[in-house]
């Protein structure tokens, strides 16, 4: 599959609206991405710029070379280090010679692999001509908060095996993949849903932690609120171990699966992850 239809599921739209076609081709070992807006989208939303590397006009627009990656606005729909690690391990489960360091997938493969329900932002993806979104089956729904300890156990088993340079057991990868594969950052985490239907990111203790990082993150969130900073709702869940699970409500989700579209600072500035060494850009920008 080298084409995907991109659909806007933004909370302020009355109905979901198709945006255009995203395509990926391999040319001499490089991934070449192209995107073509639908005429109807541009007619209705010509003032919305999705990212600096996409202009609002008809016809295909291209990105060349592996160093460029995918269009920035769609890169925001991809997982980061933790999610990519889970996705690589899941893809390697069919390999007879499994390893703790599986082959890294491409951006295109990550985009197609992760769960629709936990994907960051307001974009949804499907095969052109299909009404069904990629990885949107009912069994991929976000797990309830009651399963928090079970998810933490899976994360710890995966970390322990990787630390021993052993491939994790398939059951732990499968258990954590759907709620955790869309997540960013390096620490183990997963999405969970509370009893009111609100979606939270659960940040689990790492086996390498030397103090209760979750508790300190929770304290930092409370201090930020006291200072008048607009922050997400947070909770702290104590475990039967010495450390806590830090819960932070997802800012890109509302109850009843309403999605709030988001764009990262990298997308808004037209920058790439890790480009600071070459450009001098950093968080101050």
Residue ranges and their predicted role:
Residues 1-285:
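Phosphate/dinucleotide-binding and metal-coordinating scaffold of catalytic cores
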């Amino acid at each position: 599959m080298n084409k995907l239809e991109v659909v806007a599921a933004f909370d302020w739209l009355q109905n979901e609206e198709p945006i255009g076609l995203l395509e990926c081709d391999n040319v001499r070992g490089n991934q070449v991405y192209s995107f073509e807006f639908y005429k109807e989208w541009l007619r209705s939303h010509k003032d919305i710029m999705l990212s600096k590397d996409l202009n609002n006009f008809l016809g295909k627009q291209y990105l060349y070379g592996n160093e460029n990656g995918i269009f920035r606005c769609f890169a925001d729909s991809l997982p980061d280090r933790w999610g990519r690690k889970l996705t690589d391990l899941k893809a390697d489960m069919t390999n007879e010679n499994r390893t703790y360091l599986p082959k890294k997938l491409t951006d295109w493969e990550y985009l197609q692999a992760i769960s629709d329900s936990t994907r960051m932002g307001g974009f949804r993806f499907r095969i052109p001509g299909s009404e069904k979104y990629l990885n949107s089956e009912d069994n991929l729904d976000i797990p309830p908060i009651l399963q928090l300890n079970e998810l933490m156990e899976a994360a710890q088993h995966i970390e322990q095996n990787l630390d021993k340079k052993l491939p994790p057991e398939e059951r732990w990868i499968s258990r954590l993949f759907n709620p955790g594969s869309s997540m960013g950052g390096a620490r183990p985490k997963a999405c969970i849903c509370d009893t009111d239907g609100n979606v939270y990111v659960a940040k689990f203790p790492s086996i390498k932690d030397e103090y209760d990082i979750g508790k300190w993150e929770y304290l930092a969130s409370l201090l930020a609120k006291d200072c008048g900073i607009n922050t997400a709702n947070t909770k702290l869940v104590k475990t039967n171990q010495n450390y806590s699970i830090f819960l932070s409500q997802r800012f890109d989700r509302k109850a009843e699966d309403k999605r709030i579209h988001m764009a990262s600072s990298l997308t808004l500035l037209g920058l790439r992850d890790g480009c600071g060494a070459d450009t001098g850009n950093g968080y101050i920008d």
